[in-house]
Curated annotation (Swiss-Prot):
The keyword Signal does not apply. Keywords: Calcium, Chromosome partition, Cytoplasm, Cytoskeleton, Hydrolase, Nucleus, Protease, Thiol protease. InterPro entries: Peptidase_C50 (IPR005314), SEPARIN_core_dom (IPR030397). GO terms for molecular function: cysteine-type endopeptidase activity. This is Separin. PROSITE patterns: SEPARIN. Residues 1016-1037 are annotated as: Disordered. GO terms for cellular component: cytoplasm; mitochondrion; mitotic spindle; mitotic spindle pole body; nucleus; separase-securin complex; spindle. GO terms for biological process: apoptotic process; meiosis II; meiotic chromosome separation; mitotic sister chromatid segregation; negative regulation of protein localization to nucleolus; positive regulation of exit from mitosis; positive regulation of metaphase/anaphase transition of meiotic cell cycle; proteolysis. Its EC number is 3.4.22.49. Residues 1443-1542 form the Peptidase C50 domain.
Length: 1630
């Protein structure tokens, strides 16, 4: 292998003579030995560290070029400028190192070599030596202090391209300086192990090296044989012509001359003979080969064999002073004997450790010096030696033995390197580390670290870097001080350990692993600029740390961007982002990636999406598409970015971009293999978010087939489990979900469910485990609510929320991805909880969670989450009809929407347009967004459903089928109504009283032809406001053509009925149940009134049950949920996902029907009347169960029906009445407030106050009178307790039909009354319950007459009302009614239960004149009533003994002194007279005391503010199973808090849920004086004040006592109407 002529080494000759201008090596010793410390690190070049590298390199090249030019002409002048050159080189090395620009170092090294050659050629040998060391030290981790270190330096990736040349130059300098004797041992070791130190370079300058060997042959006297053999080896090995080196003799002669006796005297250098000879011998095998025995004397050889055969102790073979065996050139056979002796020697436990170590040093030093090739015996002995050391290391207890151990391990490590045994070298490193720990020796630890790094550098395998970092974690942990830890860390954290792998992926992997495992162990609090580390390394290292005041301003822009992106500090000048970057910088090729990573993190730090679309498109188009061109693997920096980008796109619902990015990633699977699972996960979520059904189905099938989670890594398992959650949610298969996530997966991968981190997962993974479990519980809740399992849904959702809230406290410590996932899960859990409680109609819990959500919104920070929360709250406030909050949240939501990217986020855009009622734009936006993909998504259809439209069942997803059915029924209803409106007869149908059942079926054959025809009016040109009413409105005239298609309407109504009956009730919200019950009622009412329904009774049972269900369910769930132990919400085991005994709406519907049946079969002498309001028509709905009569009836009262007959009549709709009532109550509450009463000081002020109160009382009276007259009028008898005499009734009924036959035009022409429609008996009975003595009798009777006429009209019997003689009807009917009442027997219903709906609760129905004298109590529902009755065996009235155990609370707040004075004496007498009674007076009761009073008493009386809710939590009352009958006589104790479509909440219901059979309270605030009078009268009438046991004589039941006591109030309506009773009628007995 010949040297190329243009190489600078050709200019150097080993025979170049020394001149007088040569510089002494001693003159530069300080420079040689301290070059690393004395050379300034600051650059002499213009510009700083962040300057453009091209300019700096250009200036450096100019300096080098100038030096070379000057040196060629005047070396002395050039040498004077060498300092400038060195500083320039130093700056360039620092620049390359700092900027990690190792791709440019080769050219700089070449320049440096050229300078060295110039110096050597010009005999500046001292400077040349210095430059050699300078060059080496600037490009290697382990520093050289002299040429000796250079010669024996190992090859690594950092020097393998120049080290052999540098060694040749060093050897030349040694020759020229005639320093061979000084360096001879190192030179001999160099050539003895030339395979390691020289020949590893494939580009070795063999010619120059061979000439140098020949030169050493020439100048040495005792090593001629050695260098001669080496010369012959290289001639043969490199195929060099012998004549080129020695021309006057042949190679054979040269070989023979080596055996000259003068050459054979090698002295101590003979120890290298075997090594040199073995290298020579491997190449020569002919007859001309020199034999080792020819070199050695015969006597010497036989002496060795004789000594070995004598079987002496192994220690006798050792030359302790020389640290080697007594002989050299040991044969393989002789070595085997020695090794066997050594083995026996080690097994002798009696030897002192120091002696043994000394012998082992001798053995292994000799083996290395001999250059013996490795074999099994040597390696076996090596392992035995290591085992011996490990076994006996603890017995080393002095410094000399420790030093011997260090020496031995040093030799063993060199042998491992010689033999290329990295695993055994690792064992030596482990022994060294153990010794450092045992001896607490930093020097041992430092040797351990350096040896480990040497191993890394020599092996040049970047794949081992992680293993090395893990070792350094242990090294650093064992270091005794902070400074020592830093020193050890510096051994690892430097550019050299990067092995010239300048890909971004390796840089990040190395630095982040170093940070995680090692840097954190340093526990430093200040910035340290670790030597030999690049700014990129520092930016990654400190970017992951929390250390403040990092001087990143000295770094390049790209490094600063990396640092800022990792650290989350975005303080870069925006102008810097647009500057031109250093083109030679390592990071320049990653500029786009780094820039968009920074921009993404910048946006995320500001919680914006301003650049999100741009970033994504840039990444896809400019970077991702070129991934095939990249030879390197993806970096963790990019991986984290892509994961974060996918996460942020998903988080902000940029679903379209998320799909595009995910699909691109999947198309580049080779490069993005580690990202593909993430892409799959987000792709599925995007498809699901956009309702792209077919695509989601394809992804679902793909995900179900991949990955074995039992063998997967934890992070992969977490991701895949998350995807599987989406799959199961899509399938809506609760059972499969529960089995997989409750049993299968926990058994397969328990660490995924380790909430307590018993597996000691790293914090980042542990957080992800918690987030996964939050998602599992959230989605379990969602699946449960889909399946109608409300209880399980609440429990799981509460668990998710508790976990999420616990994490929220530490949100600032979470990664961005975890933080976003947490916010999403937390908001989802709130939404779910509120939705669940909306589902069950629980207003109290909805309000609690909505307020909590409102409270934390500001802490959520992310606009998308804030907007979604505000949007959700806006919809919630619409449901609860909190108009003010609704408007406020809409305004805030619109402001939050301004921060969103509406173009990319179709979900938020459609929400925004929907909330702002821009429905046309909503549909247009969907078309624009999806374009030609519109057919692939269900989203437009979903919004059609939200907009109240119905869609084809074939395209409707199963979970939205109920909504589709409700919309369809509602739309069909609108069409029916439209048809009715077009017809002059039927358009006023809902201005007429309608009843079910209303008529008896008539046999068609007996009816005249005109009866079944659609009725026609004798009028023309009717307007929409016209109505078939009095003569003034129905003139005679020509019949008009009818537009009402009865058959079509009936068909639609029956279809509506079937659709409503097909609904799966479990899937409906409670307010939707109310809506369908209203629709069902309307459908049934119209069908019943325009056709004869043969199964009206069955239909009413169904309708009553459906109406009662939304009243019953909230109370049931309130009780059940309240009794759940809180520990269930903190039990995070997924095995709890499978929860039995869930309450189902379907089963409860059956229960409601059963309760209705039980009530009807009880045969109790009661009426159960339901009062409700229909929001669709504005009608008042009355339903009645009559157990004694086995009859169900239903009335639909139009509240403006009198107005339709008399245009002058005052109109009072239900909303208007409610508004007036609330106004009166609110004004009354204000007048009784402390703020108002405390200001009354003068007589005039008191008079003014009373005037206001009287006026309010009068307004209340007028309102009740209006309600009574305009709403109920003739149908007041519906509430009457009178029982009609059956025999008298039949006579009246015959007369009734006779009167109709005489007066109705439709019947006058026909002789047989049996041919005509007959109305139901209960309708006729209403006439008999009218009292002719009443002033408004005629008005009431007229109301009933129109009721009957409308029944006939809607069933097809046409009568023009202006042709009827109403006066005659009035006279004839009045006569018959008087006859009946004159002969009837008095018989009445014992008690009336009012089932008052939430919308009707506030009205004091009991104070209407036709109800005020009745025994009335309220109940929330049929089920509640039936439960109370069954509990007390259906015995009424309920008799309660009060001869003992009475509990009373009087004036607990201490501010009702007058009330206290009034009742103190009475209560004290009761305490004295009735054993076990208890009184708490003028002090606040403890919760436990109050609960005991409620549970353990026969009667509980509370006289104070409110209902005592301030002293006991409602949930504690609800937990009770039995509560005493209770009198809550404070203000608003029976008031309900209204929340629109949700069921109201109040103290009264709390007591009923706690098992109270009867509770009395006030509907609104009352004045203490009046309510005290009422209470006193009440106590008197029901026998509570009696001092004797005679309670059974004159005492009244509580319900009668209440009705009789109202009149004592000064303000009979404002105060007297407030008390109401809930529960059973009770009578107190002794």
């Amino acid at each position: 292998m010949m040297v190329k002529q243009e190489e600078p080494l050709n200019e150097i000759s080993p025979n170049t003579p020394m001149t007088s201008k040569s510089y002494l090596l001693n003159d530069t010793l300080s420079k040689v030995h301290h070059s690393g410390q004395t050379r300034p690190l600051t650059s002499v070049l213009s510009g700083d560290a962040s300057s453009n590298s091209i300019g700096i390199l250009a200036m450096h090249n100019n300096i080098i070029r100038d030096f070379t030019k000057i040196a060629s002409n005047n070396i002395d002048l050039a040498i004077e400028d060498i300092t400038t050159v060195d500083h320039s080189l130093n700056s360039i090395y620092s620049l390359l190192k700092s900027h990690h620009m190792w791709g440019h170092i080769n050219s700089t090294v070449k320049q440096h070599l050229m300078i060295i050659v110039k110096l050597i050629n010009n005999n500046a040998l001292g400077l040349a030596s210095s430059e050699i060391i300078f060059l080496f030290n600037e490009t290697n981790l382990f520093q050289a202090h002299s040429l000796k270190n250079i010669l024996l330096a190992d090859f690594s990736t950092w020097n393998d391209y120049y080290l052999s040349n540098l060694k040749i130059l060093a050897l030349q300098i040694i020759l020229k300086r005639k320093l061979v004797d000084e360096y001879l041992p190192h030179i001999l070791e160099l050539f003895s192990h030339d395979k390691r130190y020289l020949l590893k370079d494939p580009n070795l300058k063999a010619h120059a090296l061979t000439k140098i060997v020949l030169s050493f042959f020439s100048v040495t006297t005792s090593c001629k044989v050695l260098f001669g053999l080496k010369f012959l080896q290289y001639i043969k090995q490199f195929k060099l012509p012998f004549k080129k080196f020695i021309s006057n003799i042949t190679v054979e002669c040269f070989s023979k001359n080596l055996l000259h006796k003068n050459y054979l005297e090698m002295g101590p250098n003979k120890i290298y003979l075997n090594s040199f000879y073995l290298s020579y011998s491997m190449l020569y095998d002919g007859l001309d080969k020199i034999m080792l025995l020819d070199i050695l004397s015969y006597e010497e050889t036989t002496e060795v064999q004789r000594a070995i055969k004598s079987k002496k102790e192994f220690n006798e073979y050792c030359n302790m002073s020389e640290n080697r065996l007594l002989w050299s050139c040991i044969s393989v056979d002789d070595l085997n004997v020695i090794l066997e002796n050594a083995t026996n020697f080690l097994q002798n436990k009696g030897k002192h450790i120091s002696a043994t170590l000394k012998c082992l040093v001798c053995l292994w030093s000799t083996i290395r010096l001999e250059g013996l090739p490795k074999n099994k015996d040597i390696l076996r002995q090596f392992d035995c030696t290591v085992i011996y050391i490990n076994s006996n290391i603890k017995s080393i207890n002095d410094e000399s033995a420790a030093a011997l151990l260090s020496e031995l391990l040093g030799v063993l490590s060199e042998i491992c390197i010689d033999y290329k045994e990295p695993k055994r070298l690792s064992n030596i490193i482990s022994v060294l580390f153990n010794a450092s720990v045992l001896f607490k020796s930093h020097s041992f630890l430092l040797k351990t670290a350096n040896l480990e790094i040497s191993n890394v550098l020599i092996s040049n395998d970047s794949k081992t870097s992680h293993r090395t970092i893990l070792k350094f974690e242990k090294f650093i942990s064992s270091a005794q001080s902070a400074q020592k830890k830093i020193e050890i860390f510096s051994c690892l954290f430097n550019v050299y350990c990067m092995l010239r792998n300048d890909t971004l992926s390796f840089v990040f992997d190395f630095c982040q692993n170093a940070f995680i495992h090692c840097f954190t162990r340093l526990k430093i609090t200040k910035f340290i600029e670790f030597s030999n580390s690049s700014e990129i390394m520092l930016s990654v290292l400190y970017g992951n740390s929390s250390i403040e005041n990092i001087p990143s301003e000295n770094w390049s822009q790209l490094s600063r961007m990396i640092f800022c992106s990792l650290r989350g500090i975005f303080d870069l000048d925006p102008l810097e982002l647009n500057n031109t970057f250093d083109k030679l910088h390592l990071l320049n090729k990653y500029e786009l990636l780094i820039r968009i990573v920074y921009l993404l993190n910048l946006d995320m730090s500001k919680h914006l999406t301003t650049n999100l679309s741009k970033i994504t498109k840039l990444y896809i188009n400019k970077w991702l598409q070129k991934s095939d061109e990249k030879a390197e693997r993806i970096s963790s920096f990019e991986m984290d970015f892509v994961k974060m980008l996918l996460c942020y796109l998903n988080f902000n619902n940029f679903d379209k971009l998320s799909i595009e990015l995910s699909l691109c990633i999947k198309s580049k699977e080779k490069y993005y293999s580690s990202i593909v699972p993430y892409a799959d996960n987000y792709l599925l979520e995007a498809y699901l978010s956009l309702y792209m059904i077919d695509d989601a189905l394809m992804m679902k099938n793909q995900l179900q087939k991949t990955m074995n989670l039992s063998t997967a890594k934890i992070e992969q398992a977490l991701l895949h489990a998350s995807s599987l959650i989406n799959v199961h949610l899509w399938d809506s298969d609760l059972t499969a979900f529960q089995i997989y996530f409750g049993k299968t997966l926990p058994a397969m991968k328990p660490e995924l469910f380790d909430i307590n981190n018993d597996h000691n997962l790293p914090m980042s993974l542990y957080i992800k485990v918690i987030l996964l479990n939050i998602k599992i519980f959230n989605e379990s809740a969602k699946l449960n609510i889909k399946a109608g399992n409300v209880i399980s849904a609440v429990i799981d959702c509460r668990k998710a929320q508790n976990l999420a809230l616990s994490l929220l406290k530490k949100k600032n410590k979470l990664s961005q991805g975890s933080r976003l996932a947490l916010l999403k899960s937390l908001s989802f859990s709130f939404f779910q909880l509120i939705k669940i409680h909306i589902r069950i109609g629980s207003a109290r819990d909805c309000e609690f969670y909505s307020k909590e959500l409102s409270r934390i919104i500001s802490d959520l920070e992310e606009p998308i989450i804030v907007y979604r929360c505000l949007h959700f709250l806006h919809r919630y406030y619409m449901i609860t009809e909190q108009t003010c909050l609704q408007n406020i949240t809409l305004g805030k939501a619109n402001k939050a929407f301004d921060y969103l990217d509406a173009e990319a986020d179709i979900t938020s855009l459609t929400m925004f347009l929907y909330d702002n009622k821009e429905f046309v734009k909503l549909e247009q936006s969907l078309v624009l967004y999806f374009g030609d993909q519109l057919e692939k998504t269900f989203l437009p259809n979903l919004w059609k459903l939200h907009l109240g439209k119905d869609i084809d069942d074939s395209i409707c997803l199963s979970e939205y089928m109920p909504k589709n059915v409700i919309n369809r029924v509602h739309n069909m209803w609108q069409k029916v109504m439209s048809q009715l409106e077009e017809d002059p007869f039927f358009k006023g149908m809902f201005e007429s009283t309608l009843g079910i059942p209303s008529s008896l079926p008539v046999i068609p054959s007996t009816m005249p032809n005109n009866i079944l025809k659609t009725p026609s009016k004798h009028s023309t040109g009717l307007k929409l406001c016209d109505s078939p009413r009095s003569s003034s409105m129905t003139p005679r005239g020509k019949n008009i053509r009818q537009k009402f298609d009865r058959i079509a309407a009936i068909s639609k109504l029956k279809q509506m009925k079937e659709l409503l009956e097909s609904l799966k009730l479990d899937t409906l919200d409670n307010h939707e149940l109310s809506k369908i019950s209203s629709l069902s009622s309307l459908t049934l009412t119209i069908l019943s009134n325009i056709t004869s329904i043969h199964n009206a009774e069955s239909s009413l049972i169904t309708n009553f049950s459906l109406t009662d269900l939304p009243r019953h369910m909230p109370l049931l769930f309130d009780k059940v949920l309240n009794n759940i132990d809180n520990k269930n919400y903190r039990e995070f085991r997924v095995s709890s996902l499978i929860a039995p005994n869930n309450i189902s709406t379907i089963t409860e519907s059956i229960r409601v029907s059963a309760a209705q049946k039980d009530l009807m079969e009880s045969n109790l002498n009661i009426n159960v009347i339901t009062i409700d309001f229909c929001p669709i028509t504005g009608n008042l709905l009355l339903s009645k169960l009559e157990p004694r009569r086995k009859r169900r009836t239903h009335l639909r009262l139009p509240l403006i029906r009198s107005n339709s007959r008399d245009l002058d009549e005052v109109h009072l709709s239900f909303p208007e009445a409610t508004k007036k009532l609330l106004s009166i109550i609110n004004e009354s509450n204000q007048t009784t407030s402390v703020e108002v009463t405390n200001k009354i000081k003068t007589r005039e002020e008191r008079k003014s106050w009373w005037t206001t109160r009287y006026d309010l009382d009068k307004r209340m009276q007028q309102l009740l009178n209006n309600i009574e007259n305009s709403w109920f009028n003739g149908v007041q008898g519906f509430f009457s307790p009178e029982v009609v005499d059956n025999s008298l009734f039949e006579k009246f009924k015959d007369k009734f039909y006779e009167i109709l036959h005489q007066n109705l035009p439709s019947r006058k022409l026909y002789g047989n009354p049996a041919m005509f429609i007959k109305v139901e008996d209960w309708v006729i009975e209403l006439f008999l319950k009218l009292n002719p003595q009443e002033i408004d009798f005629l008005s009431k009777m007229e109301d009933l007459i129109y009721f009957v006429l409308d029944i006939l009209l809607f069933h097809g019997e046409e009568n023009a009302y202006d042709e009827i003689d109403f006066s005659m009807l009035h006279v004839q009917l009045e006569e018959q009614i008087k006859k009946y009442r004159a002969t009837m027997t008095t018989n009445s219903i014992f008690h009336t239960f009012l089932v008052v709906s939430s919308s009707c609760h506030l009205f004091p129905w009991e104070c209407l004149s036709f109800l005020k004298d009745l025994s009335i109590t309220r109940v929330p529902s049929y089920v509640c009533l039936n439960k109370l009755l069954s509990r007390f065996h259906y015995q009424l009235p309920l008799q309660v003994t009060i001869e003992d155990n009475i509990s009373m609370i009087l004036n607990p707040n201490g501010d009702l002194s007058r009330t206290e004075s009034k009742f103190k004496g009475m209560f004290q007498k009761i305490i004295d007279a009735k054993p076990s009674s208890q009184l708490v007076m003028n002090e606040k009761p403890e919760e436990e005391t109050l609960l005991k009073m409620l549970q353990n008493s026969n009667l509980f009386v509370y006289i104070g503010h409110g209902g005592g809710e301030q002293y006991v939590r409602s949930k504690e009352i609800k937990k009770c199973t039995k509560i005493a009958p209770s009198f809550l006589l404070g203000c608003s104790s029976a008031a309900m808090k209204y929340y629109g479509k949700l069921e109201p909440t109040g103290t009264i219901y709390t007591y009923l849920l706690g098992g109270c059979p009867m509770v009395l309270g006030n509907l609104w605030d009352v004045t203490d004086k009046d309510i005290d009078k009422f209470s006193e009268e009440l106590f008197e009438k029901m026998g509570f004040r009696c001092n004797t046991d005679d309670l059974n004589g004159n005492s009244l039941s509580v319900s009668y006592a209440v009705s009789k006591s109202r009149g004592v109030c000064h303000l009979r309506y404002l105060n007297g109407a407030a008390p109401v009773i809930y529960g059973l009628p009770i009578k107190f007995v002794s």
